[in-house]
């Protein structure tokens, strides 16, 4: 029962684990494909002419100018921006107070009409859409927003839904401040924006992360619970089996102590050459050998058969169970570990004699005895005589000093059975317990 329960739990846990794994894997793939972002980088090429320092020139005079050109892939197109090139002169809001371009009335220092210009706006105070829209309404060719306050080199894909007709990019804070410093020195800066690299980035949404985490935790809890249950059941089963083995060993020791021991003497029939050898060591019997006589009338060397009986509790030859033959009921917990020829514990008190009933039971479980041997127990109970007069023959008696008392009814039934010659009378275990009282 315990093993079938463990196997069922094992199959259930394995099926649950596989289904959960496949389900979570498919969901993760679905979330990953659904949560993806496509964005483009932008090459930012700025050109400006920085006046060369001339000590001899006056404040109003002009010396030579040094032309600078810088091109870096530092920009990132907005989410709703058209992916196209843009060119123009970089300008900021006319007033330092309106540099953030959050006010719709913000004025830019735009060049003369008909010349393209690009608005440079710092991040902050309002949405990207508001900044881009305010510049677009004043006819800017493009809008460049530089990051402020976060990671200096970070750029993001700006969302600006509703303003989709103007190129809008974001550049890092250092690059934006560099251009601002040039404009504050009244240096004209021209910017040329071109499309850079296309990027496809996959994201896992927070919902999917939470779902996968919960699924994983539940899966681990189920697996852990199954493992704990499995090992607890395995530990309990092992302990119960060891305990049952110890109890069976104790019962076997008790049974062995009730078996007759005999010392072979010179001239006994066991020493003859035609007598069967010991079935355990396959050696013949010699004088002074100590033998153990089992209830089935088989005998073996004591040193050979005792270890066998402790482990198996059966006759090495006919497989008769000595616990059953002696009427020693094992503990109920030991039933699962008993041999298959044991059909339940016997009721009634244990007997110290081999009775006709017990011999008949042995006969049914594959042991064939002659009529004289099968009735030897009954003869001993009724007449207290030896049915085989030959010296050296063995009569199984666990205690020669104690003879069990027999009721008058049992005497009459046994005597009638022997007078009629019914040597094959079969007495049940319950009848035997009523007839023979220890």
From Swiss-Prot:
Positions annotated as zinc finger (RING-type): 278-319
InterPro entries: PA_dom_sf, PA_domain, Znf_RING, Znf_RING/FYVE/PHD
GO function term, MF aspect, one: ubiquitin protein ligase activity
Main location: membrane
Source organism of the structure: Homo sapiens
PA domain segment(s): 81-183
Name under which the protein is recorded: RING finger protein 150
Lineage: Eukaryota, Metazoa, Chordata, Craniata, Vertebrata
Listed transmembrane segments: 209-229
Topology relative to the membrane: Single-pass type I membrane protein
Originating gene: RNF150
């Amino acid at each position: 029962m315990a093993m079938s329960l463990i196997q069922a739990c094992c199959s259930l846990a394995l099926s649950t684990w596989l289904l959960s794994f496949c389900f979570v894997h498919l969901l993760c793939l679905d979330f990953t494909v659904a949560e993806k972002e496509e964005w483009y980088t932008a090459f930012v090429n700025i050109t400006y002419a920085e006046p060369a320092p001339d000590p001899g020139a006056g404040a109003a005079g002009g010396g030579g100018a040094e032309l600078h050109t810088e091109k870096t892939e530092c920009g990132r197109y907005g989410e709703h921006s058209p992916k196209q090139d843009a060119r123009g002169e970089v300008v900021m809001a006319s007033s330092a107070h309106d540099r953030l371009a959050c006010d719709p009335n913000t004025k830019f220092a735009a060049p003369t009409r008909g010349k393209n210009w690009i608005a440079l706006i710092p991040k902050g105070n309002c949405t990207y859409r508001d900044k881009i829209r305010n510049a677009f309404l004043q006819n800017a060719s493009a809008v460049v927003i530089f990051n402020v306050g976060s990671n200096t080199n970070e750029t993001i894909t700006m969302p600006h839904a509703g303003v989709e007709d103007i190129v809008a990019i974001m550049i890092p804070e250092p690059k934006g401040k560099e251009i601002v410093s040039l404009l504050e020195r009244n240096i004209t800066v021209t910017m040329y924006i071109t499309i850079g690299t296309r990027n496809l980035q996959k994201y896992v949404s927070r919902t999917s992360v939470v779902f996968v985490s919960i699924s994983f935790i539940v899966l681990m809890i189920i697996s852990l619970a199954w493992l704990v249950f499995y090992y607890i059941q395995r530990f309990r089963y092992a302990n119960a089996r060891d305990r049952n083995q110890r109890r069976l060993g104790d019962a076997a020791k008790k049974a062995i102590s009730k078996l007759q021991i005999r010392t072979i003497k010179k001239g006994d029939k066991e020493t003859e050459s035609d007598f069967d050898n010991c079935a355990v060591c396959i050696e013949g019997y010699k004088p002074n050998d100590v033998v153990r006589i089992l209830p089935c009338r088989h005998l073996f060397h004591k040193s050979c058969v005792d270890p066998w009986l402790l482990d198996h509790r059966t006759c090495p030859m006919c497989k008769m169970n000595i616990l059953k033959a002696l009427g020693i009921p094992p503990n109920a917990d030991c039933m699962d570990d008993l041999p298959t020829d044991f059909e339940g514990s016997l009721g009634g008190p244990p007997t110290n004699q081999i009775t006709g009933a017990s011999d008949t039971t042995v006969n049914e479980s594959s042991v064939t005895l002659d009529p004289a041997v099968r009735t030897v127990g009954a003869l001993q109970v009724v007449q207290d005589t030896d049915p085989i007069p030959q010296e050296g023959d063995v009569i199984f008696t666990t205690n020669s000093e104690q003879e069990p008392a027999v009721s008058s009814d049992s005497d009459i039934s046994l005597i009638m059975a022997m007078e009629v010659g019914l040597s094959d009378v079969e007495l049940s275990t319950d009848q035997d317990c009523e007839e023979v009282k220890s």
